Amino acid sequence: MIGQKNNINTIIQWRCNKSVPRFIIISGDVGSGRLTFAKVIIKMINAKGIIMGNSIAEVRETIENAYTITEPTCYIFRNADDMKNESKNALLKVVEESPNNAYFIMTVQNIDNILGTIKSRGTVIKMEPYTREELLSTTNDEVLLKYCSNVGQTMEDVENIKNAEYLVDEVFQAFRDKSGTKLLKACTNLRGKQTETDKCDCTLFMRVLRKNILSLDTGLLQSIDIYHISRCMQEISRNTINNKASIECMLINILEDIKNAEIS
């Protein structure tokens, strides 16, 4: 596995001390290697790994199986940001006091999307940022290296990134012109449905916007409440949210900040 030296050292210590947690939450962006890291843990504890779904039926099936297995088994719940509360509450009962041979791993993009009661019973591992040197082992493309923070992201099509750059430039120009019309026109190029493959992926747009936001004029930057961006990032980490609508709302709020700053 590329990178993650501190996290690897942590699980080595767990193994040496015979203190591997029964419930682990791995937090990190898409492409950061959460599932790969989970497989490293499973191999370290010499357990059988099973990827489960997040529905209440599959959670209940997992619980039932966990009490009957006779060999070490690790159940993985992937992308649990959107796991419904009834599933989380059912899972809570078994992770509080795990059966003898059962381990549980949950992967999320944003740890804040997890119920506090779930989080308090798990051991949280946050995927570490990848250095430029580590990313160079997968690509030497400067565009990818500028916008990619993990190995998975380096698989992105460079043309998609360039299109996202162009769209971000249009948004920034709308901010400079204080034009809601131009802003909404730019937003029509955001992907609202999976079938709109000719439009810009919302997650990629946010990545490029965050990377370039400091290029805005100082006056504009000072009037922007960064909360709008952080809130949008949290929202789009949940698949149940309309990402395009969330970004549109964020951009409109930022434009209002800019206009209000001018008035004051």
Please give the residue ranges for each predicted region.
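Charged, glycine-rich active-site and insertion segments that engage polyanionic ligands
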Residues: 1-38, 43-46, 100-101, 109-208, ...
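Conserved catalytic segments around the Walker B and adjacent sensor/switch elements
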Residues: 45-54
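Short gly/ser-rich anion-binding loops that grip negatively charged ligand groups
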Residues: 52, 77, 104, 195
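Conserved catalytic/switch belt of AAA+ P-loop NTPases
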Residues: 67, 86-109, 116
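Conserved phosphate-coordination/catalytic loops
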Residues: 2-5, 53-57
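Conserved alpha-helical scaffold flanking the Walker A/P-loop in AAA+ ATPase domains
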Residues: 9-15, 55-76, 82, 86-94
